[in-house]
Amino acid sequence: MAKRDYYEILGVSKTAEEREIKKAYKRLAMKYHPDRNQGDKEAEAKFKEIKEAYEVLTDAQKRAAYDQYGHAAFEQGGMGGGFGGGFNGGADFSDIFGDVFGDIFGGGRGRQRAARGADLRYNMDLTLEEAVRGVTKEIRIPTLEECDVCHGSGAKAGTQPQTCPTCHGSGQVQMRQGFFAVQQTCPHCQGRGTLIKDPCHKCHGHGRVEKSKTLSVKIPAGVDTGDRIRLAGEGEAGEHGAPAGDLYVQVQVKQHPIFEREGNNLYCEVPINFAMAALGGEIEVPTLDGRVMLKVPSETQTGKLFRMRGKGVKSVRGGAQGDLLCRVVVETPVGLSEKQKQLLKDLQESFGGPTGEKNSPRSKSFFDGVKKFFDDLTR
């Protein structure tokens, strides 16, 4: 069967530069690599074909001979002397791929580091008062901690982990297929470079044990829902002495019966009767620091906001303290006595009717607009 053209195999032109050839080879080699196509004979044959084409086209001498004589340049009895018997030179492709195949096929260079401990998250519910003023709380969390018998090594007390005889402590083994070499994680030690001959009786060689621990967490003043507090090194212990992870405390502020928070400002609704709204007066309102008197001017309309400076939340990042904004809500009276109803009827008549346009600017404006609307319709 006639051999395919090397340029055609790699999908490059006859004038392709070496970097184009390397790029094409990487792409095709990853696609047809035996580790990715186990048991696929067709893929294995293509992979060998791709390697052969690559070795010729990246060797200046061999490429020149191939361009002049084709496949005949490498056949026995072909060009004088040949090129060392074809493709048995054992070229090392690890410089081309570096860690590319290492990542794909479980390799990588050097000993695999022991894994850092996992980060943990704890959801903490706070009242608004706790969030505004700050608080210290104790929490209890389940975690993995370093074994106190072997101190994280996993080995029996008085012994040490031994160097792996398979990889000689490197954590890696090299698999070679013809000209192609791939580094893989040592299957004997799982990349650690050491083996535990006599495991610790408490952690059974893991170096970590399950425990619950109690921590005191200081919550700074001014935190809000969504804020996270990081406690470095308070997560799970790392494997075999590796650094511990971190603990993240996630803040959730409970709903308050009186106040709503927006940033560093607090809002509350203050109900008043229509007599106070009309005549003015003082009313007691709550703040997080205690009760204060709010002066309501005469002719106050419902929805009006009164700002009490410095009665809000102090920023957790420093800076000025927020304000308390009181929204006045004028309530319609209910449960009126006959006397009260009569007084209101007399008051209504003094306003000049139900609309009370003389004493109600918004009513006058509204009904003037309604009158104009109907006048325009009838024209």
Curated annotation (Swiss-Prot):
One of its GO terms (biological process) is response to heat. It is found in: Cytoplasm. The keyword Cell division does not apply. One of its GO terms (molecular function) is unfolded protein binding. Keywords: Chaperone, Cytoplasm, DNA replication, Metal-binding, Repeat, Stress response, Zinc, Zinc-finger. Residues 5-70 form the J domain. Coiled coil: none annotated. Binds 2 Zn(2+) ions per monomer. CDD domains: DnaJ, DnaJ_C, DnaJ_zf. Gene3D superfamilies: DnaJ domain (1.10.287.110), Heat shock protein DnaJ, cysteine-rich domain (2.10.230.10), Urease metallochaperone UreE, N-terminal domain (2.60.260.20). PROSITE patterns: DNAJ_1, DNAJ_2, ZF_CR. CXXCXGXG motif repeats lie at residues 147-154, 164-171, 186-193, 200-207. Zn(2+) 1 binds at residues 147, 150, 200, 203. Its cofactor is Zn(2+). Zn(2+) 2 binds at residues 164, 167, 186, 189. GO terms for cellular component: cytoplasm. Participates actively in the response to hyperosmotic and heat shock by preventing the aggregation of stress-denatured proteins and by disaggregating proteins, also in an autonomous, DnaK-independent fashion. Unfolded proteins bind initially to DnaJ; upon interaction with the DnaJ-bound protein, DnaK hydrolyzes its bound ATP, resulting in the formation of a stable complex. GrpE releases ADP from DnaK; ATP binding to DnaK triggers the release of the substrate protein, thus completing the reaction cycle. HAMAP family: DnaJ. Belongs to the DnaJ family. The J domain is necessary and sufficient to stimulate DnaK ATPase activity. Zinc center 1 plays an important role in the autonomous, DnaK-independent chaperone activity of DnaJ. Zinc center 2 is essential for interaction with DnaK and for DnaJ activity. Homodimer. This is Chaperone protein DnaJ.
